[in-house]
UniProtKB/Swiss-Prot annotation:
Pfam families found in the cross-reference section: PNP_UDP_1 (PF01048)
Binding-site residues, substrate: G78, I152, M173, E174
Active site: E12 (proton acceptor), D197 (proton donor)
Primary enzyme class: hydrolase
Any one of the GO BP annotations: purine deoxyribonucleoside catabolic process
Protein name from the UniProt record: 5'-methylthioadenosine/S-adenosylhomocysteine nucleosidase
Catalyzed reaction equations: S-adenosyl-L-homocysteine + H2O = S-(5-deoxy-D-ribos-5-yl)-L-homocysteine + adenine; S-methyl-5'-thioadenosine + H2O = 5-(methylsulfanyl)-D-ribose + adenine; 5'-deoxyadenosine + H2O = 5-deoxy-D-ribose + adenine
Organism: Salmonella typhimurium (strain LT2 / SGSC1412 / ATCC 700720)
CDD domains: MTAN
Length: 232
């Protein structure tokens, strides 16, 4: 099995990258892909860049060039669920765009023409992630993750997301674009991210302060999940 892992930022991939043995670096389309073995398992780790276009471009290049069997999207996210705090884990059961609006033509809010309203994560990957969470004794929430090209840092943006997606547990800027590409390529995916901030008026301060905490937690989760997927 070859496992594809995608993170947007240097801070979100550096801990994993440093653990890859026999590492080789591929630079394509402004993205960097690091291939090798993570605890004996073949992996391809992508640093995509921030935002939906960068994530979609990177995911496509990763899938075409490295042919992974599954995709794990890792990194940080803003918490929406009331039980979440910095360092907690969110696992996707579905991903949707929070900034797409073609409702004038009868589509659901967040749905693009020719696409499902939401992109469902793979049940087996979800189950494996939740098993890792239990083993590591982490606080976690599974649910809807929403994505858009905006850092949510104020009451107006937060209220809009809560109104349109009352069940959303986290918000970030890449996951749904990655899920969209995986859907088109028929490759299973799951989003496993750690909370770096709570999406409110102080979220930019929290993000800067706690990104390292989120990166450490998400790296622990992904490393454990890769082991479980490879060896059961």
């Amino acid at each position: 099995m070859k496992i594809g892992i995608i993170g947007a930022m240097e801070e979100e991939v550096t801990l994993l990258r440093d653990k890859i043995d026999n590492r080789q670096t591929i630079t394509l389309g402004g993205c960097e892909i690091y291939t090798g073995q993570l605890n004996g398992t073949e992996v391809a780790l992508l640093k995509s860049g921030i935002g939906k276009v960068a994530a979609a471009l990177g995911a496509t290049l990763l899938l075409e060039h490295c042919k992974p069997d599954v995709i794990i999207n890792t990194g940080s996210a803003g918490g929406l669920a009331s039980t979440l705090k910095v360092g907690d884990i969110v696992v996707s059961d579905e991903a949707r765009y929070h900034d797409a609006d073609v409702t004038a033509f009868g589509y659901e809010y967040g749905q693009l023409p020719g696409c499902p309203a939401g992109f469902k994560a793979d049940d087996k990957l979800i189950a494996a992630a939740e098993s890792c969470i239990r083993e590591l004794n982490l606080n976690a929430v599974r649910g809807l993750i929403v994505s858009g090209d905006a850092f949510i840092n104020g009451s107006v943006g937060l209220a809009k997301i809560r109104h349109n997606f009352p069940d959303a547990v986290a918000v970030e800027m890449e996951a749904t674009a990655i899920a969209h590409v995986c859907h088109n390529f028929n490759v299973p995916f799951v989003v496993v991210r750690a909370i770096s901030d709570v999406a409110d008026q102080q979220s930019h301060l929290s993000f800067d302060e706690f990104l390292a905490v989120a990166a450490k937690q998400s790296t622990l989760m992904v490393e454990t999940l890769v082991q479980k997927l490879a060896h059961g």
